[in-house]
Amino acid sequence: MSKFILLVCILLLTTNIVSAASKCGRHGDSCVSSSDCCPGTWCHTYANRCQVRITEEELMKQREKILGRKGKDY
């Protein structure tokens, strides 16, 4: 009987951990303001979804990595 109660307690604990709500909205989650989103993301004004903010520096770094050349072509 004690093994059964222990198993039920572990099952309930696991269920609570899995179903616990996150404190901040991840990419694509609904939001009203940027404070609803996790750090590094912001709330898109029209879509009301958390969105990753990509800076020009990050974009150019990835472009250089993909194309193998620096600078803008335009």
UniProtKB/Swiss-Prot annotation:
General function of this protein: The impact of this protein on the neuronal activity of the honeybee brain is not known. It does not affect apparent movement or hatching of blowfly larvae. However, when injected into fish, it induces a strong reversible paralytic effect. In addition, the presence of this small peptide in the hemolymph of adult drones together with its induction after bacterial infection suggests that this peptide exhibits antibacterial activity. This peptide may act by inhibiting ion channels.
Protein name: Omega-conotoxin-like protein 1
Top-rank taxon: Eukaryota
GO biological process assignments: defense response to bacterium
Domain-level remarks: The presence of a 'disulfide through disulfide knot' structurally defines this protein as a knottin.
SS bond partners: C24-C38, C31-C43, C37-C50
Keywords from the UniProt entry: Antibiotic, Antimicrobial, Disulfide bond, Ion channel impairing toxin, Knottin, Signal, Toxin
Free-text tissue specificity from the UniProt record: Highly expressed in brain. Is also found in hemolymph.
UniProt KW Endoplasmic reticulum keyword: no
Molecular function in Gene Ontology: ion channel regulator activity; toxin activity
Signal sequence range: 1-20
